[in-house]
C-alpha cells in the first residue's frame, strides 16, 4: 500500500518583517506559512549572514528585511516590484538595498522590460554593498542583449571579463560576447576574445572560434579549430558538429599525429564513454604503435574491462612491461575482475597469482583478491570465494584493503553457525580493521557480542554489548545490544570483567567508541564563496549559489563549512534528501555522534522535524508513538511533503491513492483522495498513521510493520514463516537489501528523535552544546574539542558512512 520513495537519503524560519505584508501570497501558501518564522533565522545564521562583509554591523531590521527578500523569492517566485522597491528605499546603502535592486531587475526581466532591467543594473549600489557586482554586470549584459542593444551588451560582457576574470559568469559572458561579434559581422575579433577558453579546450569556445574563422573566410584556421574540437573535446555536445565541418572543409577525421589520437581516446575515457574510448585507443595503437605508453595501455585495459572485451584487455596488458610496476599491477587487477565477471575462474586465479608473484607489495594485489572473491560470492561460487577471501586476509592481515574480506569470512562462519569461530573473527574485525574502515563496525560489534554469548564467552559478550551503548545507543545494532545486555544483567549471567587495552577485546572496545568527521579545509577564499552563495540565495538565484559552492567544494573537498552551506540551500528548497546526503560527506558517522557533538543546524539537516503538532495529534488519535511516526516519515521522505516515488506514492508518509481511498473510507475521513490532496501534510499523516495502526495491529512488532510498509504485507507474512524467528536473525535474513536497511532505519530514527527532541518538538538543551565544528548555541563562541576526544578529524572521501 505504501511504498518508500526512491530517495537516497525546516529550518524554522522566522518572522519575516512588515514588507511581506504587502505581498499577495494567496497563490503561494507555503510562503505564507514561513512568515512568522527572520528573528530566529537572524539569530542562528552564521557570522557572514549577520555581519556585513564590509565590516558594517547590520541592524535587526535589515536582517529581517533580508529574510523577507529570501522568502519572497523562494522557489523561483518573484514578488511585486513595489514591495521590493520599498525595502530598497528604506535601507539605502546596505546589502538589503543592493539585493533588492537585483531582484527588481529580475522582476523586470521576467516582465520582458529588458531596458528597464538594464537601467536598474546600471548602478554602483550592488557592487558597493554586496558581493554580486559580477552577477549584476552579467545580468545587465543579458538584459541589453535581449533588448536588442548589442553593442552595449557586448561592452557589458567585456567589462565583466576585464573586471572579474575569475567570476563564474565570465565564461558565459565571453561566449555571449563572441556570439554578438558573429551576429554583428565582427567575427574576426572573436578568436582573440576566446583565446584563453579555447586553450583550455572548452568545447563551446572552440566551436565559436571555428565558426568565426569560417565566417571570416580563414578556412585553414577554421579547420584547425574544428579538428581541435574533434580530438580534444569529443565528449561534448558541440563535438558532434566538428566531424561534418571537417568534411565540409575538405579534410578527414583521421588523426594526423599521436597526440591527437591519444587525446581523443583519453577525453572519451575521462567521460566514461568506454566503448568509444576503446575504439579510439585501438585506432591510436594501430596507427602510432611506438607512441603509446604504458599509461595509455592501462586506460585501454580499463576501457576494455568496462565493456567486457577480454581480448582487447589482454592485448593492452601484454603491451605493459613488468618494469611499469604499479601500472601493470593495476592492469592485472582489472583483467582479473573481467575474468571473474565472465566466470572464467581458472584464468582469474592465474591472473591473481601473477599479481601475488610479481607485485606482492602493490595495493592492487589485495584489492584483486578481495574483488574477485566478492564477485565469486555474488555468483554463489563458495569455493572460489572462500579461497580468494582467505588468501587476501591471510596474506595481508590488518590491511585496510582486506577489511571487507575479513568481515565476509566472519559472516560465513556466522551463517554456518560456527559461533566460536565467528565471534573470534568478528571481534578481530573490530580490533584490527574497524579503526580503518567503519563500513561494518556496528554490525560486527553486535554480532561479535551475540556470537560470543552463544559460544559461552559471556564476559566478552557483556563487554562488547556495553561498548555498543557508547556510540550505537540510538542505532539499530545498539538497540539490539541493549536488549541482550539487559537480559544478561537481569539473569546475572555475566559478571563485569576488565580487558587490557592491548588485548583483542580491549582494542575492539576502544574502536567502538570513535567517530570520524572531516577536518575543516576551507579558508578565506571559501568563506567569500559561502557569503556570495548566501547573497545569491537571498536574491532567489539558487542555481548560481550552488555553482559558487560547487567550485569551493572542488577546491577543498568535504569541508564541513562548505557542505553545510550547500545543505542550507537544499533545505531552503525543501530538498531534504540532497541536504542530508551532502552534509553526511563531512560527517560519515553522524548517527553515532552524541547530541552535543553536532550543532543544532547540522542535526536539523540529518533529522529534520516538521509538522510536529500534526504528528502528535494524529498519533494520539491512533494510539501511536509520535516519535515512531516521525522516524518512519524520516525514512520515507526525510520530511519532504511533496515527495513522489516511482511507485506513485505521495507525500510525507508515501501513501498510494487506492490505499488512501480505502483507509479514508474505513476511518471516516471525508475527503476526496487524489495525488494532489495527498501532498497535504495533515491528510497524508492522518491516512498514514491510520494505515500504520492497522499494520501494528496485524504484525505487532515495529520491525515487521516497517518491512510491510516497505516491501508489502504479503511478503512479510511469508517471511515470518520462512525466516528465523529471532528478530535479530530475521532482520538479517530479509532477502531485500533495501528492506533490511529500511527496517533498521525506522528503529534508528525513532531513537534519534527521542534523544534530540523533547515532547514539544524542540531540541533538548544539551543538543549542540559541545559541537566539534561550528559554535556553541549558548555562547556563540567557537566550539572546542577536548584533547582526549574520541572524535577523529581527518580528510574523508565522502564515500564512507555507516548507520
Model regions: which residues?
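Short, flexible loop segments at boundaries between secondary-structure elements
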Residues: 739-740
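A short, structured beta-strand-centered segment in the mid-to-C-terminal lobe
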Residues: 673-683
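Structural signature of outer-membrane beta-barrel domains
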Residues: 712-714
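Short loop-to-helix capping motifs
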Residues: 701-702
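Acidic, polar-rich low-complexity tracts and alpha-helical solenoid repeat scaffolds
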Residues: 2-14, 18-653, 657-666, 672-673, ...
Amino acid at each position: 500500500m505504501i511504498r518508500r520513495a526512491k530517495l537516497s537519503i525546516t529550518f524554522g524560519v522566522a518572522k519575516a518583517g512588515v514588507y511581506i505584508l504587502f505581498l499577495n501570497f494567496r497563490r503561494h501558501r507555503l510562503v505564507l506559512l514561513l512568515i512568522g518564522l527572520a528573528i530566529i533565522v537572524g539569530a542562528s545564521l552564521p557570522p557572514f549572514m549577520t555581519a556585513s562583509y564590509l565590516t558594517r554591523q547590520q541592524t535587526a531590521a535589515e536582517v529581517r528585511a533580508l529574510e523577507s527578500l529570501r522568502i519572497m523569492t523562494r522557489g523561483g517566485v518573484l514578488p511585486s516590484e513595489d514591495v521590493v522597491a520599498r525595502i530598497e528605499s528604506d535601507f539605502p546603502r546596505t546589502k538589503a538595498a543592493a539585493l533588492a535592486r537585483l531582484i527588481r531587475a529580475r522582476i523586470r526581466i521576467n516582465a520582458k522590460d529588458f531596458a528597464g532591467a538594464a537601467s536598474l543594473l546600471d548602478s554602483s549600489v550592488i557592487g558597493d554593498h554586496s558581493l554580486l557586482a559580477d552577477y549584476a554586470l552579467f545580468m545587465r549584459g543579458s538584459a541589453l542583449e535581449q533588448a536588442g542593444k548589442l553593442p552595449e551588451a557586448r561592452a557589458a560582457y567585456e567589462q565583466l571579463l576585464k573586471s572579474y576574470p575569475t567570476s563564474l559568469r565570465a565564461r558565459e559572458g565571453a561566449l555571449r560576447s563572441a556570439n554578438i561579434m558573429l551576429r554583428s559581422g565582427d567575427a574576426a575579433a572573436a578568436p582573440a576574445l576566446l583565446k584563453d577558453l579555447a586553450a583550455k579546450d572548452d568545447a563551446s569556445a572552440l566551436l565559436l572560434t571555428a565558426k568565426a574563422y569560417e565566417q571570416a573566410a580563414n578556412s585553414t584556421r577554421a579547420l584547425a579549430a574544428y579538428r581541435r574540437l574533434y580530438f580534444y573535446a569529443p565528449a561534448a555536445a558541440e563535438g558532434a558538429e566538428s566531424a561534418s565541418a571537417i568534411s565540409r572543409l575538405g579534410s578527414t577525421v583521421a588523426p594526423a599525429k599521436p597526440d591527437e589520437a591519444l587525446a581523443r581516446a583519453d577525453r572519451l575515457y575521462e567521460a566514461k564513454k568506454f566503448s568509444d574510448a576503446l575504439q579510439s585507443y585501438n585506432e591510436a595503437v594501430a596507427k602510432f604503435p611506438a607512441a603509446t605508453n604504458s599509461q595509455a595501455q592501462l586506460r585501454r585495459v580499463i576501457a576494455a574491462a568496462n565493456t567486457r572485451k577480454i581480448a582487447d584487455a589482454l592485448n593492452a596488458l601484454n603491451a605493459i612491461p613488468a618494469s611499469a610496476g604499479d601500472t601493470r599491477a593495476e592492469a592485472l587487477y582489472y583483467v582479473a575482475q573481467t575474468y571473474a565477471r565472465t566466470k572464467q575462474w581458472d584464468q582469474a586465479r592465474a591472473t591473481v597469482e601473477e599479481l601475488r608473484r610479481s607485485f606482492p607489495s602493490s595495493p592492487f594485489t589485495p584489492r584483486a583478491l578481495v574483488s574477485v572473491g566478492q564477485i565469486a560470492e555474488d555468483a554463489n561460487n563458495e569455493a572460489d570465494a572462500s579461497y580468494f577471501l582467505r588468501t587476501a586476509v591471510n596474506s595481508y592481515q590488518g590491511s585496510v584493503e582486506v577489511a571487507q574480506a575479513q568481515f565476509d569470512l566472519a559472516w560465513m562462519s556466522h551463517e554456518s553457525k560456527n559461533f566460536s569461530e565467528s565471534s573470534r573473527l568478528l571481534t578481530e574485525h573490530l580490533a584490527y580493521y574497524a579503526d580503518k574502515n567503519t563500513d561494518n563496525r556496528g554490525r560486527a560489534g553486535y554480532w561479535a557480542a551475540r556470537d560470543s554469548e552463544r559460544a559461552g564467552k559471556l564476559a566478552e559478550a557483556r563487554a562488547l554489548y556495553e561498548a555498543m551503548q557508547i556510540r550505537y545507543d540510538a542505532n539499530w545494532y545498539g538497540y539490539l545490544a541493549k536488549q541482550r545486555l539487559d537480559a544478561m544483567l537481569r539473569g546475572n549471567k555475566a559478571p563485569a570483567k576488565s580487558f587490557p587495552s592491548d588485548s583483542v577485546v580491549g582494542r575492539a572496545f576502544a574502536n567502538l567508541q570513535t567517530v570520524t568527521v572531516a577536518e575543516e579545509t576551507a579558508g578565506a577564499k571559501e568563506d567569500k564563496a559561502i557569503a556570495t552563495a548566501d547573497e545569491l540565495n537571498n536574491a532567489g538565484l539558487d542555481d548560481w549559489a550552488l555553482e559558487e559552492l560547487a567550485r569551493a567544494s572542488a577546491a577543498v573537498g568535504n569541508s564541513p563549512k562548505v557542505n553545510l552551506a550547500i545543505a542550507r540551500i537544499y533545505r531552503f528548497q525543501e530538498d531534504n534528501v540532497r541536504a542530508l546526503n551532502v552534509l553526511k560527506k563531512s560527517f560519515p558517522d553522524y548517527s553515532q555522534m552524541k547530541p552535543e557533538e553536532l550543532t543544532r543546524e547540522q542535526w536539523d539537516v540529518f533529522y529534520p522535524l516538521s509538522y510536529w503538532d500534526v504528528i502528535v495529534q494524529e498519533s494520539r488519535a491512533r494510539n501511536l508513538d509520535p516519535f515512531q511516526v516521525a522516524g518512519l516519515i524520516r525514512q520515507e521522505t526525510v520530511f519532504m511533503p511533496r515527495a513522489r516515488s516511482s511507485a506513485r506514492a505521495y507525500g510525507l508518509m508515501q501513501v498510494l491513492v487506492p490505499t488512501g481511498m480505502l483507509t479514508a473510507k474505513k476511518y471516516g475521513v471525508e475527503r476526496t483522495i487524489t495525488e494532489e490532496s495527498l501532498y497535504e501534510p495533515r491528510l497524508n499523516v492522518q491516512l498514514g498513521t491510520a494505515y500504520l495502526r492497522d499494520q501494528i495491529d496485524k504484525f505487532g512488532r515495529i520491525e515487521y510493520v516497517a518491512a510491510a510498509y516497505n516491501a508489502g504485507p504479503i511478503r512479510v507474512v511469508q517471511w515470518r514463516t520462512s525466516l528465523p524467528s529471532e528478530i535479530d536473525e530475521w532482520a538479517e535474513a530479509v532477502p531485500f537489501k533495501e528492506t533490511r536497511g529500511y527496517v533498521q532505519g525506522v528503529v534508528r530514527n525513532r531513537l534519534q528523535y527521542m534523544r534530540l527532541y523533547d515532547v514539544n518538538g524542540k531540541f533538548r538543551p544539551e543538543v549542540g552544546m559541545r559541537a566539534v565544528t561550528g559554535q556553541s548555541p549558548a555562547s556563540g563562541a567557537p566550539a572546542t574539542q577536548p584533547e582526549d576526544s574520541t572524535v577523529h578529524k581527518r580528510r574523508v572521501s565522502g564515500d564512507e558512512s555507516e548507520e
